């Protein structure tokens, strides 16, 4: 995939901006706070239909405005397509999605139209944030290419919310929960099986990636840890934990309690891992998603690299450059282009460099 054009209106710090991209490697260069990451965020919005930094659409609107608009022209499989995302906060909250000028009603209809892989310092949350962040990582990855999975996940969360609301009322008749239990199990088992499949597939790329990054020194396993192993155990645990759930006022078992273990000798990486090991692990994970898109799904995603190269040591930088060499289009943000020139200089492709200062963008090369 290749992003050829990007338009922003009233998005974050940008009132109006239109950029054309004709190179494989694009650099946004500027000091912190100048709006570099806002551009990657806009690209992510076209891909994920949500921000990687902000949960509320209204907070993405430029100060003093009531709406934002994004448009991207994407080339893939010899065809060009146009994605549009718009959001209005006043007088009524409304979001509008378009694909090739036609309005799209369901978010799931846009899945797979524009795929990106983002690498950012915030990725360390996957390692340090515990089970919730690791589930979020796996769910976001699967949802990026599997609309049925996303629909199951959204439905599961709705059912879980209904069941928890009933539990909080302190109902005495378990039959009132039975319909929600059946639905929870039905959707939960579908999610469980897909997570198992994808984690197994990612592992085949994650382990070699980690070996390259660490020189074979870090033997850190990635193991899917389901809260329930199958449908029968889900049924049994829900029944056995009913009393506990009534006391707690929420559902204590299910796929919403799953974990993705990363560590060694049954010890999680958060208990012993150095910052270098954590960085290697998260890069190996993110690179594994890129490998999966490319080798399993036969899709070349666009790489978005948010000021992470300078944080890496020599060996990790060399691996990073190898990843970019084997990628398609890649967007970088950096405060210091000269500081990473020794590494990106090895990339012989034509580059586009945009200098960002006080909200203004100047094409430098």
Swiss-Prot record:
PROSITE patterns: RECF_1, RECF_2. InterPro entries: DNA-binding_RecF (IPR001238), DNA-binding_RecF_CS (IPR018078), P-loop_NTPase (IPR027417), RecF/RecN/SMC_N (IPR003395), RecF_2 (IPR042174). Its main location: cytoplasm. It is found in: Cytoplasm. Keywords: ATP-binding, Cytoplasm, DNA damage, DNA repair, DNA replication, DNA-binding, Nucleotide-binding, SOS response. SUPFAM superfamilies: P-loop containing nucleoside triphosphate hydrolases. Pfam families: SMC_N. Signal peptide: none annotated. GO terms for biological process: DNA replication; DNA synthesis involved in DNA repair; double-strand break repair; SOS response. GO terms for molecular function: ATP binding; single-stranded DNA binding. ATP binds at residues 30-37. Coiled coil: none annotated. One of its GO terms (cellular component) is cytoplasm. It comes from the Bacteria. Belongs to the RecF family. The RecF protein is involved in DNA metabolism; it is required for DNA replication and normal SOS inducibility. RecF binds preferentially to single-stranded, linear DNA. It also seems to bind ATP. NCBIfam families: recf. This is DNA replication and repair protein RecF. It comes from Leptospira borgpetersenii serovar Hardjo-bovis (strain JB197).
